[in-house]
A protein has these predicted regions:
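Conserved phosphate-binding/catalytic loops in two-lobed NTP-binding clefts
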Residues: 108-109, 281-306
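Glycine-rich phosphate-binding loop plus the immediately following alpha-helix
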Residues: 124, 146-191, 214-215, 219-223, ...
Length: 335
């Protein structure tokens, strides 16, 4: 069964075709990141306007690349939550129009469920149950994936998401947007022990907090400026990256140890971070667990993940009518 996926929850306009939830057939993305970089981050109004301009061409490109006609598609899967509401609505309304005109099922997909489903495209052998750290610009969750459509949140951020912290620290250091890749590049020549940044303590064994870590970087930069000095950007980037990836890895590995999970995964934009991947690989080996990592091209926002999860939502009977509304916030464990 072929599923057409549509994703527009942030600044990337995406469409893809996936077969049977596991086989990536096409994957097309039009990004406005370069334009957003001029403003130091995502401007929702600009993101929505670019989605309107690009979405029909991107969807057509995905079908053409797949060599598939719209009438051969089994359903139209679309991100309906969470995300920038204006951006979400562009993709949702486009998907409604496609589903109506082609008389195909409309399949609502939660954005974070989609990130997890990207793992099925990289690892067709992976099946629930497993533990997954989902870390992106807007979310940081440790999730027990019980089956393809049932999720239990074990831990979450109590303030800033990991990707958000990367973006804000990158802006503080003058590294540009998106912050994750920018910080990682700067950190390559830095000393991760140069600045001893704090490890915030929060209630809940698997919860995380990054607001204090972000503020610690800002304070060090401001203090240096007040003295007429400058922090070493490479060292600060390396120190921040070391601390935040250490926190994320520690929490996921603790959850795996406590639950006895033998399959652990990461997903979302932060899953592309090389140091996080290395740290988790070493930790998983010590636990005797297998670590599953998504392909780098499937870490950030894309529609392939939406189409993959859409297949399982459809199989579970989770379709919607044209009254489906977009939501800015919604837990991954919604019923």
């Amino acid at each position: 069964m072929y599923i057409l996926g549509i994703e527009s929850s942030c600044d990337d306009t995406c469409a893809a075709v996936v077969k049977d939830g596991r086989e990536l057939v096409s994957n097309c993305v039009a990004s406005s990141a370069a334009e957003q970089n001029l403003y130091g981050g995502v401007v929702p109004e600009i993101a929505s306007r670019r989605h309107i301009e690009h979405i029909s061409q991107v969807a057509r490109a995905a079908l053409d690349e797949a060599g598939t006609a719209l009438d051969e598609i089994g359903g139209v899967a679309v991100t309906f939550a969470p995300g920038l509401i204006g951006a979400v609505l562009v993709g949702l309304n486009f998907a409604k129009g496609l589903a109506l005109s082609a008389q195909k099922p409309l399949i609502p997909v939660h954005h974070l469920r989609g990130h997890i489903a990207a793992l099925y495209l990289t690892h067709p052998e992976l099946e629930p149950p497993f533990l997954c750290l989902v870390a992106s610009g807007g979310h940081s969750h440790i999730v027990r994936v019980q089956d393809y459509t049932h999720f239990e949140v074990l831990g979450r951020t109590v303030d800033d998401a990991a990707g958000e912290a990367f973006d804000k620290v990158a802006r503080t250091l003058g590294l540009g947007y998106p912050g994750g890749p920018a910080v990682s590049r700067a950190a390559q020549t830095g000393d991760p022990k140069a600045y001893p940044l704090p490890t915030p303590h929060v209630e809940g064994p698997y919860n995380v907090s990054f607001s204090g870590l972000k503020t610690a970087v800002l304070n060090l930069v401001n203090k240096a400026q007040m003295k007429g000095e400058r922090v070493n950007v490479a060292d600060m980037a390396a120190s921040f990256q070391f601390r935040i990836t250490d926190i994320l890895a520690e929490k996921l590995l603790l959850a795996a140890q406590d639950t006895g999970a033998k399959q652990i995964c990461i997903a979302g934009g932060v899953a592309a971070n090389g140091l996080l991947r290395e740290t988790l690989a070493a930790g998983a080996k010590k636990l005797g667990a297998r670590l599953y990592l998504p392909e780098l091209q499937l870490c950030g926002d894309n529609a392939a993940m939406v189409a993959a999860q859409g297949f399982y939502e459809y199989r579970a009977g989770n379709t919607a009518d044209l009254n489906l509304n977009g939501l800015a916030t919604l837990g991954i464990d919604y019923l």
